């Protein structure tokens, strides 16, 4: 008899078929208490869980006594109670490598669109505002040869540094938990403390996961240390930034502009002051959102769940010691 798994995110037909070759698959719309209650017998028997964008906490795990592995279609896993999973010896799988290049593309797009005011001036053209040769009020700022500060030199940080160094001749500063020898050798990146990075960078790109240590890592104190001409980019996790402090910094002119793919609350409230600022490019968490990459992430998540329930946890496992 095949193990039972719960799928709470739609999959392409071929990936669903692959999953069904290994498991009895039960599809649900979400992991809300109502859904769990209505499908209590299914949740009680499930050994695997696959999906994204839902909280997996201790309360849910209490309803799933046979759960052995959960696989998320994402690199981030701050919506999972890792301690609760680990205490119950449940493996947590994620997709850390598939989206690297695509998210780096998004970061570079935010750098370019904020510096060159692409969204703002495009809207002016659409509104009929281009009636004569453009003047300084349409101008942006250069990207090439400007200093890029990267906070978080992981896979995505490395991919961004590659684009910036080779494509735009940008000097690279970075701050991370440890020195990154490859970044220093390939991109001539310079490690520095966060204060130095903030003071010297023309673009500050934040690429950090959300943890207890990184929550509101960026606040009023950090924005005050940045150049008034600097542009802030966040494509990591929204709550790493104190959004009210960011809004205040933009309103006071402490920083020049911001390109944001993530927010403290998602979706972003329609009455957020960020949406009325011409110098803010706000996009709806599209970091990995291409057809190719989202398919690759889903395929990886399917393979991860198959591997995990077969006892193979050599890669993509957040808590591999559970399998020991």
UniProtKB/Swiss-Prot annotation:
It comes from the Bacteria. Signal peptide: none annotated. The active site is at residues 237, 266, 285. The keyword Kinase does not apply. It is found in: Cytoplasm. Gene3D superfamilies: NAD(P)-binding Rossmann-like Domain. It catalyses: glycolate + NADP(+) = glyoxylate + NADPH + H(+); (R)-glycerate + NAD(+) = 3-hydroxypyruvate + NADH + H(+); (R)-glycerate + NADP(+) = 3-hydroxypyruvate + NADPH + H(+). Its EC number is 1.1.1.79, 1.1.1.81. Catalyzes the NADPH-dependent reduction of glyoxylate and hydroxypyruvate into glycolate and glycerate, respectively. Belongs to the D-isomer specific 2-hydroxyacid dehydrogenase family. GhrB subfamily. Homodimer. This is Glyoxylate/hydroxypyruvate reductase B.
């Amino acid at each position: 008899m095949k193990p039972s798994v719960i799928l709470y995110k739609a999959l392409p037909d071929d990936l669903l078929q692959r999953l069904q070759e290994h498991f009895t698959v039960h599809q649900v719309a979400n992991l809300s208490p109502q859904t769990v209650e209505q499908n209590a017998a299914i949740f009680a028997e499930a050994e695997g869980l696959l999906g994204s964008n839902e909280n997996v906490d201790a309360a849910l795990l209490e309803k799933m006594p046979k759960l052995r592995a959960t696989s998320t279609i994402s690199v981030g896993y701050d919506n999972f109670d890792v301690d609760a999973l680990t205490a119950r010896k449940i493996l947590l799988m994620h997709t850390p490598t598939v989206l690297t290049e695509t998210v780096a593309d998004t970061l570079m797009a935010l750098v370019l669109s904020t510096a060159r005011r692409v969204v703002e001036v495009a809207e002016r053209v659409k509104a009929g505002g281009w009636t004569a040769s453009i003047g300084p009020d349409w101008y942006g700022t250069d990207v090439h040869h400007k200093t890029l500060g990267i906070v978080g030199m992981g896979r995505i940080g490395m991919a961004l540094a590659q684009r910036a160094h080779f494509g735009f001749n940008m000097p690279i500063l970075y701050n991370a938990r440890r020195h990154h020898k490859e970044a220093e050798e390939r991109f001539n990146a310079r490690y520095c403390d966060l204060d130095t990075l903030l003071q010297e960078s023309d673009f500050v790109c934040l690429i950090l996961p959300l943890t207890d240590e990184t929550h509101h890592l960026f606040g009023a104190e950090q924005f005050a240390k940045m150049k008034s001409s600097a542009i802030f980019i966040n494509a990591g996790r929204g709550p790493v930034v104190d959004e009210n402090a960011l809004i205040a910094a933009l309103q006071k002119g402490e920083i020049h502009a911001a390109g944001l793919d993530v927010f403290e609350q998602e979706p972003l409230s329609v009455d957020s002051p960020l949406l009325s600022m011409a110098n803010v490019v706000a996009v709806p968490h599209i970091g990995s959102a291409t057809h190719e990459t989202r398919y690759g992430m889903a395929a990886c998540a399917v393979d991860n769940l198959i591997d995990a329930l077969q006892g193979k946890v050599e890669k993509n496992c957040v808590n591999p010691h559970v399998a020991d």
